[in-house]
Amino acid sequence: NYKNLVISESAVIRLFVIATTVILLSIITGIVLSIRKAKKSNDKVWNVSSKRLVINFGIPLVTGGFFIVFLIEKEILSLVAPLTLLFYGLACVNASKYTLGDVRYLGITMIVLGLLSTWFLGYGLLFWALGFGVCHIVYGSMMYFKYDRN
């Protein structure tokens, strides 16, 4: 029950450190894999299209991140899980214009999961597992078999 949930300040700091670490490791992994792929195909990693991709992905994601931090500060915790899915989905849809069009479908799926998670408050971890776990595994597998498999 989110109404009776009390989180100590040290727990909030630990959760923030964990979340920041996961985000940074995800970004670093994405950059490393992009550099490797670009080198294999003799492409530039940083060009006009990649700059637009980062900007269009970053604006909704960073906005959502700040919004969620403000909600946590106000102890409105019930919306944290749904909003992470929702803003990530919006970022994917917004960035899909500058990358594979299939990213749009991942984004729409995340938006739907975020809205469902808002409707079914209290099941945020389940929706996180579906969105950030199952959907990414399925999406990654589909992209591998569609574009990268030799």
PLM segments and residue spans:
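Membrane-proximal helix-loop-helix units in multi-pass membrane proteins
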Residues: 44-103
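Membrane-water interface of alpha-helical transmembrane segments
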Residues: 9-17, 75-78, 82, 97-107, ...
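Membrane-interfacial segments
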Residues: 37-42, 71-75, 146-150
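Phenylalanine-focused residue identity feature
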Residues: 16, 57, 66-70, 87, ...
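Terminal transmembrane helical module of multi-pass membrane proteins
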Residues: 91-150
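Lipid-exposed faces of alpha-helical membrane segments in multi-pass integral membrane proteins
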Residues: 21-25, 29, 59, 63, ...
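Selected alpha-helical membrane-embedding segments in polytopic membrane proteins
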Residues: 1-65, 69
